[in-house]
Amino acid sequence: MAAQPSGETSDACCDGEDNEDREPEQLWQVAKLRRAAFSGVLLTASLVAAWAYPLWPVVLGLKALALAVGASTFVPSSLKRLAEGRVGVGTLMTIAALGAVALGELGEAATLAFLFSISEGLEEYATARTRRGLRALLSLVPDQATVLREGTETIVASTELHVGDQMIVKPGERLATDGIIRAGRTALDVSAITGESVPVEVGPGDEVFAGSINGLGVLQVGVTATAANNSLARIVHIVEAEQVRKGASQRLADCIARPLVPSIMIAAALIAGTGSVLGNPLVWIERALVVLVAAAPCALAIAVPVTVVASIGAASRLGVLIKGGAALETLGTIRAVALDKTGTLTANRPVVIDVATTNGATREEVLAVAAALEARSEHPLAVAVLAATQATTAASDVQAVPGAGLIGRLDGRVVRLGRPGWLDAAELADHVACMQQAGATAVLVERDQQLLGAIAVRDELRPEAAEVVAGLRTGGYQVTMLTGDNHATAAALAAQAGIEQVHAELRPEDKAHLVAQLRARQPTAMVGDGVNDAPALAAADLGIAMGAMGTDVAIETADVALMGQDLRHLPQALDHARRSRQIMVQNVGLSLSIITVLMPLALFGILGLAAVVLVHEFTEVIVIANGVRAGRIKPLAGPPKTPDRTIPG
């Protein structure tokens, strides 16, 4: 059979040849199915010949050819594996076919080879089809790109792009690789990568990614990655590498299937030997061969891999990267979700919404002092403060006080910026409380130990946050918010989002400790930015990185990466994984049930070789078809709705 989607082959089942270099898109393109069809034609011709004009040499010749053609799909690879000391279902089928020939049942052997070759081909086709879901990301990259060479636009192959090249991207064209916009503005369609339907406005200095579709503007983009190392290629490489990690269902199936094959061979030998001593040798040898086929765990061995690859491929097309079967199964068991506030529940784009002053200071003076201390910081709060003022003078001797704020010198005077508690809010205490109740973070500004003012910075909730939280709670998930912000601000934002369990003023190690406590009670996922929340992500059963597109660290750190900025992908991924896990359980249960039913029927001679093969391979087709169902996932229905909420401030 075809190679397992994980990149490994299971000795219990997959005895087939390597997949064709080009993955088949149509049934007729599968070589094994073409051979199976030819085998079926020969077998049918032998039956017609036996009925219409019984020349037995012709009939036997047709059956022998049907057997040879069908067996060519699994016997060569089975013998090769046997020489390497490995046995699988193909080995069982080979023994059964040879045994049937030895007993003079050439028609039975040909039927077995024909039916088994069909299942081999169907599995190869299904595996290739599901694998294409992930690999389809690479097809988003165009074969050619336009670059500036010595001032002239030149068309080159995407594989010939080098870091530093200047790409020209015209309206409607896809970006051939990652880069930074040097000139031009446009709205990029990134739906095929992140699953978000709303185009993203970009301009000079913005980072853009391979596979994005340019809107109406003409862009000049500086190339930052080659075709082999762009964001899409790295994503596919990371996910495919992680697919070797197997989940509980796959490990269970492997634990049953691998030892089952040699056990079946031993049991069949005992049945044949004991039956030959106590009864008719021919009858019991034939029954032993039927038992050999009846207990073959091929459907069991493919029950999970086909489902895993179909599910991961479908999710990847909507901007949800699930790193392997283990991550998929764990995602399907999650019952509690811990959400980081900044960058997950909020957009991580804070703005200054209010400035309160005292001791004769002006609004601009307060902002100028704060900006001087934050001038060299890249913290989101610093970005908000710097964007709110035109002041450009930077403070000197700036030192950070962990968990408190900044201290430095400006125009020869000592200035401080920090949270209430480290600095005394004094007469601004009521203003600070009002800011925090409005969901803002308040910072105080002081000069020469004299309070100048308080600045309120608020990072707005994502418009879809309340909808997502409500959906999670309706689905039975326990939702908790974790943040390093103060209690008042955290409580205000949590109330807007509909979250009841809130933990504030947490350091990274505190978040990890709380996640570990949640995990001790029930399966828990931690959702964060994948970088600053690394300890908490590692402490959870499953780490989910939000907005991971272009962030290699996030993709590598987390088990699941939501490539876009739409939080609705979180419940979408959870529901998809839960459904996929249910399909895995169905497949494993059906496979084991069929083996359990067929074994006694074969042992007591109720079913013959052809009937057992037919039932067994029909089961495999059902398992494959059921697994492919995991590839169905509905895209998000339009952009998130902005809630109508008024916040006092």
Cite the ranges covered by each PLM segment.
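Conserved ATP-binding TGD loop and adjacent catalytic N/P-domain core of P-type ATPases
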Residues: 412, 441, 447-586, 644-649
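P-type ATPase nucleotide-binding
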Residues: 170, 352-478, 487, 496-515
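Membrane-embedded alpha-helical bundles of multi-pass transporters
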Residues: 6, 13-14, 48-55, 75-78, ...
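Actuator/coupling domain of P-type ATPases
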Residues: 2-4, 15-27, 47-50, 57-144, ...
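Bilayer-spanning, highly hydrophobic alpha-helical transmembrane segments
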Residues: 39-44, 252-279, 287-296, 305, ...
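Small-residue-enriched core segments of transmembrane alpha-helices in multipass membrane transport
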Residues: 64-67, 117, 259, 285-303, ...
